[in-house]
């Protein structure tokens, strides 16, 4: 985990929370989080965020390809953090294949608040928002890039998230326009790459790591699912 020296204390605390949460997941034998200081572009020097959420830390869970357990990991990470007493939200940014509603056991449509923002549905004490709440399960999302980005912006800025300790973003698989825009337009504290042991999956995972490095988002770690 590469961090800036200025915020080392903050990331040491975050690393401890990650380790404690990951240790509780079934099938995890051991977890080691190593911190390395490096000089990076400061938040103030980045372009101003288009996506505004009042969260202490925003963590993106990404993968180079689909079918590697990215969404499963994102949901389990959110639940583990919630069980540690943190205020957690999960945003399903996988517009074309939303799976968080089913994994969290939620159905129904979000209601609107008096200020015309959507109220996220809750499960296991976690606030959840997904395009899957707004379209039928059997309806394909046949949208071009601009419509996808508009929907993502709505799920950030048009939702009553409240104050969160952590927002977990389940990104779409790959390294396309949606992933790049989310990385550049939201104040990500870090990212986690999920992969499987196969060479093809690991090659795609490297692309994801390189994408986050280019936009100066720390890669917290790589999770290898079996």
Please state what every model-predicted region is:
Residues 57-94, 209, 222:
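Walker A/P-loop phosphate-binding motif and the immediately C-terminal alpha-helix
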Residues 51-56:
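Phosphate-binding P-loop
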Residues 81-143, 149, 153:
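Phosphate-binding loop that captures ATP/GTP phosphates
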Residues 1-22, 34:
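A short interface-forming secondary-structure element
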Residues 23, 78, 82, 183:
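Gly/Ala-rich phosphate-binding loop of Rossmann-like dinucleotide-binding domains
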Residues 23-46:
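A short amphipathic beta-strand at an alpha->beta junction
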Residues 135-182, 202:
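Phosphate-binding/switch loop-helix module in NTP-utilizing enzymes
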Residues 165-166, 172-226:
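Conserved catalytic-core segment of NTP-binding enzymes
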